Every structure is written in C-alpha cells, then in structure tokens.
C-alpha cells in the first residue's frame, strides 16, 4: 500500500473510460470538420481566406502567435521546477512542459497553413540567409523544439524510474535519476535562454523588425510578446489543471494553484504597463506611421474589442479578481467552490483578452503601411 501511494506521487491517476471515450469522440469530430477546410485551403490557396496584397496576414497568423506564445510561456512555467527547483509548482510542471511541445507543433501548423505554397516551407530549413530575421527565427524555433522534446522525454523517463523505485530505491537507481535530473536542469537552462530568441521573445523581435509597420517597430514589442506569453500560459495552465483534475475525479493541488495565480496576477500588472507603453508613445508623438494604427485600436473600428474585450475583460476584471482572491479574501473563502468558479472565470477572461491583444496588434497595423526608401 505504501509503495502504491509513492507511485501515485509520480504517476497521475488515469482517466475514466467514459472521459476517454468522450474525449476521443470530440477529437474525431473536430478532425473530420477541419478536414474539409484544410482541403479547401490546399485546393484554392489563400484566396479562401480573403488575403490581399494590402492585408497579407490574418487570423491564421494571430492563432500562430497565440500558440507560439503559449508554448514559450508554458515552457517558462515548467522551468520554475526543472531549473529553479521551486517545489510548489511540481504538480503542474510536467503538464506545462508537455503542453508546451504540443502548442509549438500547433503554432507551426498554423503558420504553415498561412504560407502561399506549403511545399516551399522546406526551403526555409534547407537554405539559410544570414540577413533574414525569419531565417534566424525558424532555426531558433527548431532548436527550441529539439530541446523541449528531449527534456520532456527525460522527464517522462525520470518519473517512470521514480515510480518503479518507489518501493525500494537503490543507490544505483538514485544515481541514474540524479544524472537524468542534471541533464533536465541543463536543458531547462538552455531552453529558457533560447526563449529570448525563439518562442516567445523571438516572435516579438521578428515583428519589431518589420519597418513597414509602425505599430510593431520598437523594442517594447518584444517585451510585450514575452509578457503576453507568461500571462496566457499561467491562465491556460490553471484552467487545464482544474479541468484534468475534475475529469480524473481528483482534487487539484492548492499550493500549485495559489502559486500560479500569483504568477498570473504579477504578470497581468506587467502586461498592463507593456500595453500602455505600446500605444502611448505613438499617440503622443503624432507620427502617422504608428499613430494611425493606434487610433484604429483605441477610437476606430477596433475600439470595442480593445476597450471591452482587452482592457475590461482581459486586464481590469481579472487583475482585480485575482488580487482580491489572493490578498484580501478570507482564507476559508479562497478554498471554496465559489472562489474556484470566480478564478476560473477570471482565467477565461485572460485567455480571451490575450487572444484579442494579439488580434489587435496584428490587424490594426495591417492597413497602415510605411514606404521605406531603398538604401
């Protein structure tokens, strides 16, 4: 019995048969529904998405940067355990790392769909242009994926060995696990360093390098993408952890949830500052290159999405609710079912706001193009 209890520490409880069947049916339905639209894309090209010379990017790119940011943010959260060794985040570390790999694959699928000729994407891997920011970003993405996959495999191997040795650990098993733990920590450090030039920081750097879009150009864009990634990942991980625990009929770890909520609250404050510094300088400068795009967001056709969707639902309400739950609500209420639902609604609002922020950053800048003279 004691051995079985120790094994459960390392291996999560399996899903029920009913939950597995329901999940398989949902995935099958989504795959069948998406197959038609994928065929339409391959058969009819980008015309089915309404792409033009003036609006070359659209919702696919928005979804791409959402998932790439989610991948980078989840990896950073997993590094709280695998690099910094903060024990309270241990219950969600492996989930964060696994979801990071999945999100990165999904982001690459969406950017592949956005390419005019998907078959030409192989050329970006085979040929390298030293002066191309896109070429550097693709290489950083591939390196980041190799690191993340290798680390995830080692984590699974380490957890399996820990479960097998839970009853009678030997010195040899402890030595092997120690070596694997060191390798995991080294890979985590490499992955965190790569995140500044890969997902999520590299995506922001790529946008900031586009001189023809005044809203994107500038150093704050890269910081904005980085903070957006942490905010989105924290909210997503809280929702996913609660949902999976409910499907397993288990109780989520309260300490891990409190830690994630604190990360979310702090990163929301940082995101608010980043959004302010992204839009305030262009408005104050009056430069048409960027002020026009910001005007579209704050007072033009995209204003309802900005003020109601992003500011109110995505920033103000979640920040106020998370701050109240963490620092001002009674301890008993913080652990109640009502508080859990309030936190769930707050996290859902953050996810909506994070998607809208990426949508606004991409779409508001597209109608405004700067003519860059040839040098």
Predicted regions: what is each one?
Residues 61-66, 94-95, 104-108, 135, ...:
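Hydrophobic alpha-helical transmembrane segments of multi-pass small-molecule transporters/permeases
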Residues 345-364:
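Final/C-terminal transmembrane alpha-helix of multipass membrane proteins
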Residues 3, 117, 161, 285-288, ...:
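Structured alpha-helical bundle/scaffold domains in large eukaryotic membrane-trafficking regulators
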Residues 122-126, 288-297, 368-375:
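Membrane-interfacial helical/loop segments at transmembrane boundaries in membrane proteins
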Residues 36-49, 53-54, 66-127, 133-167, ...:
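Transmembrane-helix bundle segments that line or gate the permeation/cavity pathway
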Residues 10-14, 20, 24-36, 88, ...:
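Long, contiguous internal "core" modules enriched in hydrophobic/ aromatic residues
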